[in-house]
């Protein structure tokens, strides 16, 4: 039979098999049969993939390989995202480091040339990284959000939405990043708690000794104030409404207006209104027809409207203005104040609300069908709780600002006529104005938000706007696997665009995967230095152990706490699979498959367990319960197959039953490797190819089917009893400090074991002799009790009974103290309510384990009395 080296070496087999699969074209669909399609969430071209990508790709590949083995015509489309703001930032840093120049110094054309070189380099690297993970994507269909086909799709969508009145240009308050010098959508702003100050400032009433005290966290913005607002029902200020105030330091006259937006409980109940630099103030200004004065430039420095403060950074201006307010008697007091402040999701700079001309998508008309699809179950979220998160956001959806002040990205397809002012919006480049015929045109300088092109990903990657065969066959896709952090950025927008342009959902199921945290539960970040590089893990442990680790930890609705020790544990599992296969292969010299007749209880038991495992793993994968599927096959292979069946088979391989045992070993190993294949593709291919039943590739082998005729509940019950007897004997040895190699005599009461069972007991339990008794003999310890059946281990001549009794009492005392401690902990309401769920569960498990051990020792002690 085929030989297998003594050591499992992942590096040796991984490159070999991936190349083989690609050459054979296994990842390219054939276009016949029931289809299953999925698009990869495209990684950004800003560097190496991280552990979140590794989890995302692993989970997708598990489903894809499973579906392929189930006979589906599978298409998994790979690709990368141009990642506008992130890539531009990275290239700008690279330029400064390597050439000491800014993008403005080299100009748009040269900057884009360098960025394309960057993009191509990182796309190649990402491709190799995805291959290293074992992802069975169809590389012949790889796409990029800036490639020609997708660019055509982006332009078509922009133009069509514009013509329907769903894209418009307007002056609105936007989130401005002074570092990236671009607008950000609401979803690109990360809110963090800031310890700040609340400044109380007097605003004098014109021609009066009266004044209103206003509380603000941003005194620097008062340079742009155009009113003070109070609540219409606030009795304190009823006589002030309609009066004119003099703006401190500036001298501008501003009105007092009544508006229901104002919270009378905040500060003094009177708020300054700065319409050009606060979204809520902007709405107040619209309701009261107030002017809007911009005071910041694009760098968040005070502009010419700020008088003597012109040129100061916003924080410098705050310091100077507070000092001047104090000196001139306007500052009443300063209080400590904690509040939420928006930051740029890319560079962490505090964003500046800014009045700006931008392009927007009117989302409410698009959201209607996207809401209905999830409400009526046409699109399902896994775990189900994300449905509510999605719907709550969609019900309150705001218009989407899609223009970005960047160079890298899809340039907005709008040309402004410099002669007549007409906006030419077109899918093709415009040479002359459609209104006046002038050739004096200027294209909009801005690019589209990265998420605009990503929103078209499920259909643009399949060839839209062309009516391709791929589009007809593989749209809508079946599954999207993604993180919760981009439900609004990406998932919701894909659903809206899918219904608008394809008149159909983009996918049926959305699986929201876990966040990968470090072993302490902290988010992985550069600042903490706690990230784990998946490629380094692959180098050290192999892709398969890493994939299996991520899968077995991927419980729905619970973040992953990733301890690097897990990789070592599942590398040991890979070694176990390797060694078990090696054992089977070494015992197949004269292999001859025989009918499954004259099976012994142990054979019926393993075949029953196998078929139940097939059913459990299949059901788990159908419901995206990756951890349950992985844990089930792990337990079956390690415990049932290796620890019990292989051990039980060793003496039988030397008897006339050899061919039958070989047949069962091969059958179980073959099915196990196929069940494991979606999780550990490289290892399973290497091992499966050595089996006498192997075909061309495990990648295209059939998924194991449940053979119900091989399920024997009686045999399972009988062998389970036998296993529990053996475990009981092992436990007695362990508690009595006897080596597991110590052969012992066992007495059984209330049950006559068969010849086969006696042989198994002796083999598996290292038992010298099995005798049958009517009552418990002296100097024995109870190993097993089930209804009328009991088993005892003969300890005569093996231990000093008095010493053992003392030792056991001491151990029991320690265990009781631990039980008391754990019970006290669990009785503490604060601990149960405030500690993480997994910590509480772990404490309960420890308590149960200690109680069980104490009961076991009490039983043994009674036996020794």
Swiss-Prot record:
PROSITE patterns cross-referenced by the UniProt entry? AA_TRNA_LIGASE_I (PS00178)
Q: Where is this motif: 'KMSKS' region?
A: 523-527
Q: Which UniProt keywords apply?
A: Aminoacyl-tRNA synthetase, ATP-binding, Coiled coil, Cytoplasm, Ligase, Nucleotide-binding, Protein biosynthesis
Return the motif ranges for 'HIGH' region.
43-53
Q: Name one GO molecular function term.
A: ATP binding
Which InterPro entries does the protein's record reference? aa-tRNA-synth_I_CS (IPR001412), aa-tRNA-synth_Ia (IPR002300), Anticodon_Ia_Val (IPR033705), M/V/L/I-tRNA-synth_anticd-bd (IPR013155), Rossmann-like_a/b/a_fold (IPR014729), tRNA-bd_arm (IPR010978), tRNAsynth_Ia_anticodon-bd (IPR009080), Val-tRNA_synth_C_sf (IPR037118)
- Catalytic reactions of this protein: tRNA(Val) + L-valine + ATP = L-valyl-tRNA(Val) + AMP + diphosphate
From the UniProt record, list the coiled-coil ranges: 797-865
Q: Name one GO biological process term.
A: valyl-tRNA aminoacylation
| Enzyme kind, highest EC tier | ligase
Q: Which residues bind ATP?
A: 526
The primary location reported for this protein is cytoplasm
Which residue positions does the secretion signal occupy? none
Q: Where in the cell is it found?
A: Cytoplasm
PANTHER family assigned to the protein according to its UniProt record, in alphabetical order: VALINE--TRNA LIGASE, CHLOROPLASTIC_MITOCHONDRIAL 2, VALYL-TRNA SYNTHETASES
Give the protein's biological function.
Catalyzes the attachment of valine to tRNA(Val). As ValRS can inadvertently accommodate and process structurally similar amino acids such as threonine, to avoid such errors, it has a 'posttransfer' editing activity that hydrolyzes mischarged Thr-tRNA(Val) in a tRNA-dependent manner.
The free-text domain remark for this protein reads: ValRS has two distinct active sites: one for aminoacylation and one for editing. The misactivated threonine is translocated from the active site to the editing site. The C-terminal coiled-coil domain is crucial for aminoacylation activity.
Q: What protein am I looking at? A: Valine--tRNA ligase
State the organism of origin.
Answer: Thermotoga maritima (strain ATCC 43589 / DSM 3109 / JCM 10099 / NBRC 100826 / MSB8)
Species lineage: Bacteria, Thermotogati, Thermotogota, Thermotogae, Thermotogales
């Amino acid at each position: 039979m085929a030989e297998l080296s003594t050591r499992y070496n992942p590096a040796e087999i991984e490159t070999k098999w991936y190349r083989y699969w690609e050459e054979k074209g296994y990842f390219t669909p054939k276009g016949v049969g029931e289809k299953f399609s999925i698009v990869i969430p495209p990684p950004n071209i800003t560097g190496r993939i991280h552990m979140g990508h590794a989890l995302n790709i692993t989970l997708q590949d598990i489903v894809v390989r499973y579906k392929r083995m189930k006979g589906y015509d599978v298409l998994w489309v790979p690709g990368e995202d141009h990642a506008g703001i992130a890539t531009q930032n990275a290239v700008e840093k690279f330029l400064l480091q390597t050439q000491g120049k800014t993008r403005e110094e080299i100009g748009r054309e040269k900057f884009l040339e360098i960025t394309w070189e960057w993009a191509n380099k990182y796309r190649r690297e990402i491709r190799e990284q995805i291959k290293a993970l074992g992802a069975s994507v169809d590389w012949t269909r790889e796409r990029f959000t800036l490639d020609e086909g997708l660019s055509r799709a982006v332009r078509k969508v922009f133009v069509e939405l514009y013509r329907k009145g769903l894209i418009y240009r307007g002056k609105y308050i936007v989130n401005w990043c002074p570092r990236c010098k671009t607008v950000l959508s609401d979803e690109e702003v990360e809110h963090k708690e800031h310890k700040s100050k609340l400044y109380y400032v007097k605003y004098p009433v014109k021609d009066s000794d009266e004044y209103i005290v206003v509380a603000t966290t941003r005194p620097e913005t008062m340079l742009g104030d155009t009113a003070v607002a109070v609540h219409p029902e606030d009795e304190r200020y009823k006589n002030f409404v309609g009066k004119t105030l003099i703006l401190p330091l500036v001298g501008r006259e501003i009105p007092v207006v009544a508006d229901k937006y104002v919270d009378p409980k905040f500060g003094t109940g009177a708020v300054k209104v700065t319409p050009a630099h606060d979204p809520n103030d902007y709405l107040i200004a619209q309701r009261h027809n107030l002017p809007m004065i911009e005071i910041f430039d694009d760098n968040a420095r005070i502009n010419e409207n700020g008088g003597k403060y012109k040129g100061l950074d916003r924080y410098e201006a705050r310091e100077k203005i507070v000092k001047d307010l104090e000196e001139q008697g306007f500052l009443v007091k300063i209080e400590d104040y904690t509040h939420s402040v928006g930051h740029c999701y890319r560079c962490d700079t505090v964003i500046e609300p800014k009045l700006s001309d931008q392009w927007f998508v009117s989302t409410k008309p698009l959201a209607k069908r996207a809401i209905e699809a999830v409400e009526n179950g046409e699109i399902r979220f896994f775990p189900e709780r994300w449905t509510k998160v999605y719907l709550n956001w969609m019900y309150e959806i705001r218009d989407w600002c899609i223009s970005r002040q960047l160079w890298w990205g899809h340039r907005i397809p709008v040309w402004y006529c410099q002669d007549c002012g007409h906006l030419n919006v077109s899918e093709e480049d415009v040479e002359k104005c459609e209104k006046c015929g002038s050739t004096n045109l200027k294209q909009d300088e801005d690019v589209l938000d990265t998420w605009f092109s990503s929103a078209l990903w499920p259909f643009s990657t399949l060839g839209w706007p062309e009516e391709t065969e791929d589009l007809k066959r593989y749209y809508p896709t079946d599954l999207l696997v993604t993180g919760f952090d981009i439900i609004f950025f990406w998932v919701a927008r894909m659903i809206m665009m899918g219904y608008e342009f394809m008149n159909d959902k983009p996918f049926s199921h959305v699986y929201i995967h876990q966040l990968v945290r470090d072993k302490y539960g902290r988010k992985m970040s550069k600042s903490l230095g706690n990230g784990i590089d998946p490629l380094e893990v692959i180098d050290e442990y192999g892709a398969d152990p890493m994939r299996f680790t991520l899968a077995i930890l991927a419980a729905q609705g619970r973040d992953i706490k990733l301890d690097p020790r897990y990789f070592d544990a599942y590398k040991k599992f890979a070694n176990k699979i390797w060694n078990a296969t090696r054992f089977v292969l070494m015992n197949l010299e004269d292999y001859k498959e025989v009918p499954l007749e004259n099976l012994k209880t142990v054979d019926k038991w393993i075949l029953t367990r196998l078929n139940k495992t097939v059913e459990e793993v299949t059901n788990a994968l159908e419901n995206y319960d990756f951890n349950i599927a992985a844990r089930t096959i792990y337990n079956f292979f390690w415990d049932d197959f290796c620890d019990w069946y292989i051990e039980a088979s060793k003496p039988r391989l030397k008897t006339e039953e050899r061919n039958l045992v070989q047949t069962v070993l091969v059958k179980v190993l073959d099915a196990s490797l196929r069940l494991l294949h979606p999780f550990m593709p490289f290892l399973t291919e290497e091992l499966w190819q050595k089996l006498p039943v192997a075909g061309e590739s495990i990648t295209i082998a059939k998924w194991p089917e449940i053979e119900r005729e091989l399920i024997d509940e009686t045999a399972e019950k009988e062998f389970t009893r036998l296993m529990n007897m053996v475990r009981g004997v092992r436990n007695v040895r362990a508690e009595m400090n006897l080596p597991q190699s110590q052969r012992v005599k066992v007495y059984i009461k209330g049950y006559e074991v068969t010849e086969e069972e006696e042989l198994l007991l002796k083999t598996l339990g290292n038992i010298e002799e099995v005798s049958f008794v009517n009552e418990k003999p002296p100097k024995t310890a109870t190993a097993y009790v089930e209804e009328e059946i009991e088993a005892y281990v003969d300890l005569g001549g093996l231990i000093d009974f008095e010493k053992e009794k003392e030792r056991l009492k001491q151990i029991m005392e320690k265990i009781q103290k631990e039980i008391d401690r754990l019970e006290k902990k669990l009785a503490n309401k604060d601990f149960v309510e405030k500690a993480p769920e997994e910590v509480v569960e772990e404490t309960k498990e420890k308590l149960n384990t200690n109680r069980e051990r104490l009961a076991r020792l009490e039983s043994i002690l009674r036996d020794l009395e």
